[in-house]
Every structure is written in C-alpha cells, then in structure tokens.
C-alpha cells in the first residue's frame, strides 16, 4: 500500500515573534489528494504553536497527547515535549506513529520525533518534511540577510520550498505568537 507523502513545516523566531507555517498538500504516491490541508494549529489556550509532518491521523493523536502534557505541566513547552517524547518512545502503540512535530512558543522552538528526540535548533529556525531542507535554507538566508519579521520569512521560505519540492505546494498557513492582526 502506498503511503501519504509530503509536507513542509517551518518555524522562525525573530525579535519576540515566532511564526510556524506549513503547506497544504497531501500526496498519496504520485497523486495529490488535497491541496488545502491545515497542518499547523494553536494549542494550550493559543500560547503554543504546533505543526506536523507525516501521517495525518498519527499527527492528530500526537497533538492530543502533547496538549494533555501541556495542561499537565502548565504550558511548560520543554517539559511537555520531553514527557511526550518519553511516552511516544515507550508506548507500544505510539511507537508505531509516523510523524514529526514542531512546537513553539515565543521562547523555544522544538522538534519531537518518535525515537524520543527533542531537538532545539542551533539557529532561530527549524524545518521538517519533504521540503524542509529548501525551506530551512531559504529561511536562514532571509533571517541572516533581511530585516523581515518572522511571519514574512516563514511565508516566503515556504513559497520557495513549494516551488522546488514536488510534495509541497504554495497553499501556506502561518500562525504567529504573539498574534499579528493580519494572518497569512
């Protein structure tokens, strides 16, 4: 059976703003099933952003588990991420889930994997998914050579990834913290 492919998620932090965005394409084999999927959401009373790459049903399960950890640990992002990673790695059912989560608040960006990894980026951006390397390269170039805010860097870098990666499109959703008046 063919598997669902593709997604690009990018998080960028600059000057007190964090932006997390993703494309909208869902692909099965060589066929685009949907072009406007929403892979980014707000959690914990709107104070945490999360995006996923991988199997959609698996990601929703992980969103629920992560939000439960956020509630349990009063919104502490790093502690909640570590606890989810431990649960994800040790639980026989969760271990089979195929997704990556990128989570962020205004202080931290983290990627969580099913192998128990909780990764904080070296620079103020993090990208995952099939177009992740393209979005990361574009985002880093924009971060280092322009004064654009985080949300505009995220939007533009994801558009560039959508132009290069066949599993990524230009239907971009960007969420920001703190919230801006005009969301992409």
UniProtKB/Swiss-Prot annotation:
Allosterically activated by HslU binding. This is ATP-dependent protease subunit HslV. The keyword Endoplasmic reticulum does not apply. Its EC number is 3.4.25.2. The lineage of its organism: Bacteria, Pseudomonadati, Pseudomonadota, Gammaproteobacteria, Chromatiales. Keywords: Allosteric enzyme, Cytoplasm, Hydrolase, Metal-binding, Protease, Sodium, Threonine protease. It catalyses: ATP-dependent cleavage of peptide bonds with broad specificity. GO terms for cellular component: HslUV protease complex; proteasome core complex. One of its GO terms (biological process) is proteolysis involved in protein catabolic process. The active site is at 7. It is found in: Cytoplasm. One of its GO terms (molecular function) is threonine-type endopeptidase activity. A double ring-shaped homohexamer of HslV is capped on each side by a ring-shaped HslU homohexamer. The assembly of the HslU/HslV complex is dependent on binding of ATP. Pfam families: Proteasome. The keyword Flavoprotein does not apply. Disulfide bonds: none annotated. Belongs to the peptidase T1B family. HslV subfamily. Na(+) binds at residues 162, 165, 168. Protease subunit of a proteasome-like degradation complex believed to be a general protein degrading machinery. Its main location: cytoplasm.
